[in-house]
């Protein structure tokens, strides 16, 4: 079996388990952020941007099916934030920064968004961070803000909320995305290290090429890639 397909299956199973663990409530919604928000984007590094996004899609879709929720257009389009976060995390090119100006423009084109224009300025932070993607912490920050920017635009056009609520969320975003940045950074480092150790066993040694050698705990990592 192709190593990436096998790893995709493993990742999907782990993702479904992570999806069952809630970590915070999504303001303005009846849903919660789950542990998968921290694990989901890392699939882009191990599987590549496309397969990482597909794996994130399957995790979300299977979770909806298992919970017998309606799999309608709005539900599917809300898969995009995590999928694009995986794409961002998996791509090395700085061109991924384009997602943030696009989201800012889409946010400001909305009448409610224009009244809460300062909310969209938050995305200038990950835009700048995109030019330092070699660093895992900056790549993690960009990935979680990719999910945030895309998710916010979808939420704005789907549910609205008042300008006052959007503005009041600004300090919450900094705390929330700071936590998610550290969470993605930690998840990636731990997952990569465990995979590196497990692939020392002959039975799964063929998965070794999926290990990111730059993201293993070492002096070199903290000096150049952390």
Please provide the spans of the model-predicted regions.
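Loop-helix junctions at membrane interfaces
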Residues: 1-226
């Amino acid at each position: 079996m192709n190593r990436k397909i096998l790893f995709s299956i493993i990742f999907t199973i782990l993702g479904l388990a992570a999806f069952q663990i809630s970590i915070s409530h999504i303001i303005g919604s009846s849903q919660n952020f789950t542990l998968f928000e921290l694990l989901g984007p890392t699939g882009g590094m191990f599987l590549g941007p496309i397969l990482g996004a597909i794996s994130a899609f399957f995790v979300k879709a299977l979770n909806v099916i298992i919970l017998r929720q309606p799999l309608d257009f709005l539900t599917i389009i809300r898969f995009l934030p995590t999928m694009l976060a995986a794409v961002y995390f998996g791509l090395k090119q700085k061109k991924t920064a384009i997602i943030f100006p696009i989201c800012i423009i889409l946010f400001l084109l909305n009448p409610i968004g224009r009244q809460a224009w300062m909310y969209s300025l938050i995305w200038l932070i990950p835009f700048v961070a995109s030019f330092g993607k070699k660093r895992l912490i900056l790549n993690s920050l960009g990935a979680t803000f990719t999910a945030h920017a895309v998710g916010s635009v979808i939420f704005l056009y789907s549910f609205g909320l008042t300008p006052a609520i959007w503005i009041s969320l600004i300090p919450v975003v900094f705390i929330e995305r700071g936590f998610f940045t550290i969470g993605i950074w930690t998840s990636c480092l731990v997952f990569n290290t465990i995979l590196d150790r497990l692939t020392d066993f002959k039975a799964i040694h063929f998965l070794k090429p999926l290990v990111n050698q730059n993201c293993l705990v070492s002096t070199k990592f903290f000096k150049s890639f952390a």
